[in-house]
Every structure is written in structure tokens, then in C-alpha cells.
Curated annotation (Swiss-Prot):
Its EC number is 1.13.-.-. Belongs to the DODA-type extradiol aromatic ring-opening dioxygenase family. It is found in: Cytoplasm; Nucleus. One of its GO terms (cellular component) is cytosol. Keywords: Cytoplasm, Metal-binding, Nucleus, Oxidoreductase, Zinc. This is 4,5-DOPA dioxygenase extradiol-like protein. Binds 1 zinc ion per subunit. May be involved in the metabolism of aromatic compounds. The keyword Ribosomal protein does not apply. GO terms for molecular function: ferrous iron binding; oxidoreductase activity, acting on single donors with incorporation of molecular oxygen, incorporation of two atoms of oxygen; zinc ion binding.
Amino acid sequence: MASSRLLDWMSRMRSVPQLERLIPALYLAHGSPFLMLPQSSDDEVFSNDSKLGGLHYQFLEQLGPFLLEKFRPKGIIVFSAHYESRGSVEVYSRDDENPLFYDYYGFPDYLYQIKFHSKGSKRIADQIISALKEYQIPAKTVSGDRGLDHGVFVPFKIMFPDGLNIPLIEVSMHTLDPMQLYKVGQALQSLRKEYLIVSGGLNIHTFEDLSAFNEDTAADGYKEFQLDILKAIETDKQNDRLNKLLGLQLHPYFRKAHPREEHFVPLYVAAGLGSSGKSKVVCDLYGAVSAFFGIDE
């Protein structure tokens, strides 16, 4: 079952057409620090699929090399559910090593010793700022030692275990409003000529109902919500797709799955980035949906 599911995901990825004009944008289920915990750990909230060596881990292992080989990006731009700002979009700007921000608590010590090597790029950061300002979206570069949060370095450590030799730039979400984030994505579409743009979150993220994280214990409403997400993503026509994606916030289980929507709305950045093309779900694992947007038609 597990191996056939992984083969299915790989088949979906390989079916994405070879790059012609723009690199597809990726909506990525970034997972949690539990991806670094062994399946034998005592935790009963998260299934083994969400832990070290589980199905989500295996998907990320396969995804990283695929992205670099298929699209050969000159850099990676990433939005994370864990990087919010107020008033304007923040673009992390530096040329040296990206530090890491261990923004999780109560985990074993070794999870605070994880290393992931990558460098930023002030030049690419400036390109992002220019593209956003062309759309009258307030934006500024920031520096300092905040570093990449775990919504970036946890999945990227699995995807690129030896680090990256192309620049990696993190960008904030300046709002949780779906249409504003969709417009942020649209503003950056031209950068897909050279760069892979990733928008990371989770389609289920609640600490008010821990049973929701595990498919074996989750109420049927969470599973129905995920099915509606999958259908919305793969809607063919751009306007219909956008309407269905926006309509997901009216689903009876939306607020149960997201008491606060910061982990859901990165989906709208990816949708805006790929608003001019097709979209394809490449991982339908429960609670860990990932998809490409902006596939050439």
C-alpha cells in the first residue's frame, strides 16, 4: 500500500510537462518537527506517516531531487506559514549563510541541533521587491539573524539533505486575506522564469482537536474537507478554481481544521503564482496535500 502510493505520487510528478516557459509554483505541506522523530516515539497524536521515514518523509525525499533535476531553478523563493509580518511583505535579504530559527518548543535536544546549509541573495531579494511594488504591494527587505523557520528548514532538510548550492530566500505573508495573498502570487509570476517559488503550509492545523492530525482518529468532516481541497485545486478553469479555493473557507470544517488560518492561506499565494496555467495535486496524503500551480497548458 505504502510503496504503491509513493509510486503514484512520483508518477504524478513526472507527468508535469518539461519546462517550457515558467517553473510551476509549489504548494508544499511543510510538515512538522515530528518528521524528524522516529516512528517508535511515544507520541500518539501524529501517525507514523508524519514521522521519520514515513510516507510524508518519503515523498519529500523524492520531491527535492525531482525539483532540481526537472526545473533546474537558479534559486528558490519560499513563503512559510511561520513567517508573518504587518503592513508590508518582508523579504529576507543577505548573501551569506542563512541562519536557522528553531521556532518550536518541548522537543528532544537533537531537534535543536539540526543544520541546513543555504545562502541568500540580495539580488534576488531586490527582484522580489521590484515585482511586488509594480503591483503596488508594500514590501521591504529585512536582514538580521531571524533565520529560516522550521516551516522551511524541516522539509528542506529532507528534500535537500546536503544543503543547497543555489540561493534560498524566505518571504513573509503580510496578511491572512486570501485575495491579497493571491495578488502577491500574481505579482511574482514573472520570477518563475528563473526561480522555483514554494508556498508552505498545511491543509489541517489545529491544536483544539488533536485527533484531527491522524487519519485513523479524525472525524469524517476533516476528510471531507480535504477531498474538497483536492477538487478545488484541480478545477480546470482559472476563475472557477479561484472561486472554489475561496469557497473552502465556508466549509463547515474549515474553522475546525484552522482555528487560525495562517497554515491554510499559503495555498492562495501558490494559486496566484500559477493562476495562468493548470494545477495538479502531487501528494494527497491525509493532512499533507502538496500541489503544483501554473503548469503549462
